[in-house]
Design a protein with these regions (language model features):
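Residue-level detector of alpha-helical secondary structure
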Residues: 100-107, 123-134, 140, 144-151, ...
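Bacterial signal peptide processing site
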Residues: 23-25
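C-terminal motif of bacterial Sec signal peptides marking the signal peptidase cleavage site
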Residues: 18-21
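Alpha/beta-hydrolase fold active-site neighborhood
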Residues: 113
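Bacterial N-terminal signal peptides that target proteins for export
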Residues: 1-9
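Conserved positions within compact, well-structured domain cores
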Residues: 27-109, 121, 167-335
Length: 335
């Protein structure tokens, strides 16, 4: 594989391709400053009890691991494992337990006042049907037929809710989790080792309370604190800082421990392009922008196996029919 392919896939930046192909001047030696780096206390995410190592860099506290938080719907809400395919929404159908729950919930919805017919309550019959259903003495079809006889509007409303079942939080959670667990089994447990790959929209909502998705300026502050000259940190669509990627990657002296997780990269074609696992790392920032005046994009950081520098530039946030997926680190300010 050409060394240029990962860069083209990640950013589609003519400037980046030119920079990588031309080589430029001899690399300048940078004396990085580790005096501002200290190990931080472990952080336990109260949402799921995941524990993260942290590192203090100046007056910032960074997670030293990629985020592993799964939103309710997993990939349906923008958090993917490696090579995970989208959930087929047409196949999210309720099982008997879910239909029973929908019937029970709909019947007891106070908005419908017991589904009385001409002022006559049907509760005594329906309560009995639901009990028989839960005991396995009636089928769902039999219950629906009997309730339809008592009040056709009930079954009409139930039909609408069944058609919208895939939109319910519990349905999305079950379908997303099932898809995720199958994918993790197939790929050997990618997320446990590398964290989720997030869409830009999901990345913006993924941080625990008190933390945030770092902005482009947060990243530049990290880089400057480590000793990257300000003028170089500000370079856009460019590789910056000879040795900076080594410092930030797993085993580097900064303790940041960026993992070469790969990502689902930007490319014009509509297929999935999970690329560069064990070769490159990609991180979203919280800083959005637009390309060509209207194309949604965001600032990112990446490093690839063919350089010790870190790229600062922009990436589109979506492809044709599929999202772009990168890793997430979280940061907070120290008082």
């Amino acid at each position: 594989m050409s060394i240029f392919k990962p860069l083209c896939l990640a950013l589609l930046s003519a400037a980046a391709l030119f920079a990588a192909s031309c080589g430029g001047d001899e690399p300048k030696t940078i004396q990085y400053n580790l005096s501002a780096v200290q190990p931080g206390e472990d952080f336990t995410d109260p949402r799921d009890n995941n524990v993260y190592h942290t590192v203090r860099v100046g007056d910032q506290l960074w997670m030293a691991e990629n985020l592993r938080y799964a939103p309710n719907g997993y990939s349906l809400d923008g958090a993917y494992s490696w090579n995970e395919r989208p959930v087929d929404l047409t196949k999210i159908v309720p099982d008997n337990a879910a239909v029973t729950e929908l019937i029970d919930r709909l019947f007891h919805d106070p908005k419908y006042n017991g589904w009385a017919v001409a002022g006559t309550p049907i509760a005594p019959w329906v309560e009995g049907f639901i009990k028989q259903l839960k005991r396995g003495r009636m089928t769902i079809a039999e219950v629906r037929e009997n309730i339809r006889y008592l009040n056709p509007a009930f079954d009409d409303t139930l039909t609408v809710r069944l058609l919208k079942y895939a939109e319910l939080p519990e349905a999305r959670h079950k379908a997303g989790m099932t898809n995720f667990e199958k994918t993790e089994k197939d790929n050997g447990g990618y997320v446990a080792k590398n964290g989720f790959l997030y869409t830009f929209a999901a990345a913006q909502k993924a941080a625990p309370e008190g933390w945030r998705l770092p902005t482009d300026e947060d990243w530049k502050k990290l880089e400057r604190t480590l000793g990257l000259p300000a003028a170089e940190a500000d370079l856009n669509e460019a590789w910056r800082g000879e040795g900076l990627a080594t410092l930030l990657s797993v085993g580097g002296k900064s303790g940041f421990n960026a993992i070469r997780t790969g990502g689902n990269l930007y490319q014009r074609e509509s297929g999935n392009f999970f690329e560069n696992k064990d070769k490159a790392w990609y991180f979203w920032t919280a800083t959005p922008t637009t390309l060509q005046d209207s194309v949604p994009a965001a600032y990112v950081r990446l490093s690839d196996h063919f350089t010790t520098k870190v790229w600062r530039g922009t990436s589109r946030v979506a492809n044709n029919y599929r999202p772009v997926l990168y890793s997430v680190r979280c940061v907070k300010d120290l008082k």
